[in-house]
Regions:
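Flexible C-terminal active-site loop/helix
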Residues: 1-3, 9, 254-317
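Short loop or secondary-structure boundary microenvironments that flank
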Residues: 19, 104, 127, 131, ...
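Catalytic alpha/beta core domains of metabolic enzymes, predominantly
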Residues: 184-277
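Conserved, mostly hydrophobic/aromatic
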Residues: 4, 10, 68, 81, ...
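Metal- or metallocofactor-binding catalytic centers and their adjacent structured scaffolds
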Residues: 6-7, 12-79
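N-terminal amphipathic alpha-helix/helix-capping segment at the start of soluble metabolic enzymes
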Residues: 78, 82-96, 290-300
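Hydrophobic faces of well-ordered beta-strands that scaffold small-molecule active sites
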Residues: 13-15, 96-102, 121-125, 149-153, ...
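Metal-dependent enolase-superfamily TIM-barrel catalytic cores that perform enediolate-based chemistry
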Residues: 86-196
Length: 317
């Protein structure tokens, strides 16, 4: 994780970059760009104009672009004495419940993993390891809990297994299936959508707003991740485009600290589902912001993102 700070006129705006090698983005590349210097406008004004000035200097790294979009929005909203959710036109009380991801590396650890997720109403389970293994994982989880489950197939199925699994999962309190096939296999995804009793949510097929027209009628919904799409402005555009097409919307994340997760949470009242647990899956989160109460996201009140430093690390602000 790399933190970006915009410190001007006594106001500090924070942003976070959490790059993913899956999209050929790496921390060292971000640090090299930052070490080379970023040219800023002489006068800091409109957040969108600021971002459009900075983004071309980010080397095409979306995680760095979103970090700058966070920092300017946090700074500008503090300056204007409003929250970011107000800027986005979101109502904090409409923030959804978030799922909690349980990663299954060892079947014997399933009871422990399920217990970790017991404070949440919804679990997210990653499958796509073969029908027999996937069913064994689900059966083991169902022996421990009847919580609603969201399944991420991680591009791991083919059409035959996808049809079988979607029908099988529909009988086991599963809410939807995320990314059943490779992102290049839209034809089989369209076929599965006709056969599946469960909604299909795009992940790798919904990187940014340009992808949405391509998957209309193929998926039932999209997963927006700020680190993939490149800014809160782009995330908001994706929300609007999906709504125009009657598509469901999930807001997801990478492994991020409370800076990135809180930024996404300010957008969450505008979506249907949230999977914003990245800060809960790390042990050294140096910030505090959005919290979870009874499984529901609770946005911090105050100006900007409402994020504050919770550690004594001297190199952080």
């Amino acid at each position: 994780m790399v933190y970006v700070y915009l410190n001007h006129d006594g106001i500090l705006g924070r942003g976070e970059a959490a790059p993913s090698g899956r999209y050929n983005e790496f921390t060292n590349d971000i640090l090299n760009i930052l070490d080379g210097g970023i040219d800023l406008q002489e006068t800091i004004g409109d957040p969108l104009e600021f971002s459009e000035h900075v983004f071309p200097q980010c080397g095409g790294i979306k995680a760095l672009e979103v970090a700058f979009s966070m920092a300017i929005l946090d700074w500008w909203c503090q300056k204007e004495r409003i929250s970011v959710y107000e800027y986005l036109g979101a109502e904090p009380l409409k923030a959804p419940k978030t799922s909690y991801t349980i990663s299954i590396g060892d079947m014997d650890l399933i009871p422990e993993k399920v217990k970790e997720g017991s404070p949440f109403h919804i679990l997210k389970v990653k499958l796509g390891m073969g029908i027999d293994q996937d069913k064994a994982i689900m059966n083991a989880i169902r022996e421990e809990t009847d919580q609603t489950i969201r399944v991420d197939a991680n591009e791991g199925w083919d059409l035959t297994s996808g049809i079988e699994m979607c029908n099988w999962l529909a009988e086991r309190n599963v809410e939807f299936v995320e990314q059943p096939f490779k992102s290049t296999n839209l034809a089989d995804t369209a076929t599965l959508r006709k056969e599946s009793p469960l909604p299909l949510i795009a992940d790798e097929n919904s990187l940014n707003s340009a992808d949405i027209p391509k998957i209309e009628g193929v998926f039932d919904g999209i997963n927006i991740k700020l680190m993939k799409c490149g800014s809160l402005f782009e995330g908001l555009k994706m929300v609007k485009m999906a709504r125009e097409r009657d598509m469901q919307i999930m807001l997801g994340c990478m492994i991020e600290s409370s800076v990135g997760i809180t930024a996404a949470a300010h957008l969450s009242p505008l979506v249907d589902y949230a999977d914003l647990d990245g800060n809960l899956l790390i042990n050294n989160d140096p910030y505090r912001g959005v919290t979870v109460e009874n499984g529901k996201l609770v946005l911090p009140r105050g100006n900007g993102f409402g994020v504050s430093l919770s550690s004594n690390e001297s190199n952080l602000m």
